[in-house]
């Protein structure tokens, strides 16, 4: 047999997290930009990515309430028992956008940044002037073939930096438009060739905080259990007094299996 010691958040722990979410919710209402940094700063378990997502990409408790919130408004705070969290969210924006986008690209990289920019500008100008995209791609050792990107490929992933910049460019570029995109040490000449499956999409900033026990609550539980062990130094005494002390006694038949 063994004793399973469950440490749960105290009323004080929950009240402290509730207060933090209340404060974060008030700040969320007045925040107008850089939601990524703000959501990170309040310790949310749901990071904000500055892309339009399908409704289903957000936590299920947010999805269930999304239609009750208008763009620019804040919903919550509310408790969600399914994941033991206190939450609020803000619908930052809503749009109708393609869920699948076809594109092609030419990656441009030269000896240094100035030469890279000059070469990229030259290729971009040529394509805008009517040059064949695939022929130019082959000239620089690439195929220029088209690829499809769907939202399922990036929704729910950790996206930032150049990846965010690249995906944003694909989403924001019109069909047949060409973009000269600086990415790190290189440039990408990007052309969107097709878009399909238009759906409602959202940008939603979510404050999601688990109601977890504090260090003080854990230390209290540890000390209480240590005192119980000291007062019941034998297995017989522990078994006899565990339930009265509030501990659950369990069988461990598979301990040596």
Predicted regions and their residues:
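Acidic/polar surface patches and capping/hinge elements
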Residues: 1, 67-100, 184
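Well-structured core secondary-structure elements of compact alpha/beta domains
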Residues: 1-29, 41-61, 87-128, 142-165, ...
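Glycine-centered tight-turn and secondary-structure capping sites
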Residues: 26-36, 68-81, 117, 126-134, ...
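Short, well-ordered alpha-helical segments enriched in acidic and aromatic residues
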Residues: 35-44, 133-142, 240-248
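Internal mixed beta-strand/loop scaffold within catalytic domains of large alpha/beta enzymes
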Residues: 63-72, 161-170
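Intrinsically disordered, low-complexity segments enriched in small/polar residues
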Residues: 74, 139-142, 154, 182, ...
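Short, surface-exposed beta-strand/loop micro-motifs that present aromatic residues
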Residues: 178-180
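Active-site and NAD+-binding cores of ADP-ribose-processing enzymes
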Residues: 187
């Amino acid at each position: 047999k063994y004793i399973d010691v469950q440490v749960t958040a105290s009323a004080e722990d929950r009240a402290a997290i509730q207060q933090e979410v209340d404060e974060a919710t008030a700040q969320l209402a007045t925040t107008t930009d850089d939601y990524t940094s703000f959501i990170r700063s309040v310790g949310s378990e749901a990071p904000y990515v500055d892309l339009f997502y399908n409704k289903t990409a957000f936590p299920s408790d947010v999805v269930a309430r999304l239609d009750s919130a208008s763009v620019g408004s804040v919903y919550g705070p509310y408790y969600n028992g399914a994941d033991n969290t206190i939450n609020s969210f803000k619908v930052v924006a809503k749009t109708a956008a393609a869920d699948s986008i076809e594109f092609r690209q030419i990656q441009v990289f030269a000896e240094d940044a100035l030469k890279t920019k000059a070469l990229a500008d030259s290729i971009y100008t040529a394509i805008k002037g009517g040059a064949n995209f695939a022929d130019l791609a082959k000239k620089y050792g690439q195929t220029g073939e088209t690829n499809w990107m769907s939202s399922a490929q990036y929704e729910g992933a950790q996206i930032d930096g150049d990846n965010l910049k690249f995906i944003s460019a694909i989403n924001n570029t019109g069909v047949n438009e060409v973009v000269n995109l600086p990415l790190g040490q290189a440039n990408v000449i990007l052309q969107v060739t097709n878009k399909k499956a238009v759906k409602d999409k959202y940008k939603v900033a979510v404050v999601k905080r688990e109601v977890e026990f504090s260090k003080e609550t854990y230390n209290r539980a540890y000390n209480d259990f240590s005192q119980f062990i000291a007062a019941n130094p034998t297995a017989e005494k522990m078994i006899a007094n565990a339930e009265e002390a509030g501990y659950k006694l369990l069988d461990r038949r598979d301990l040596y299996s």
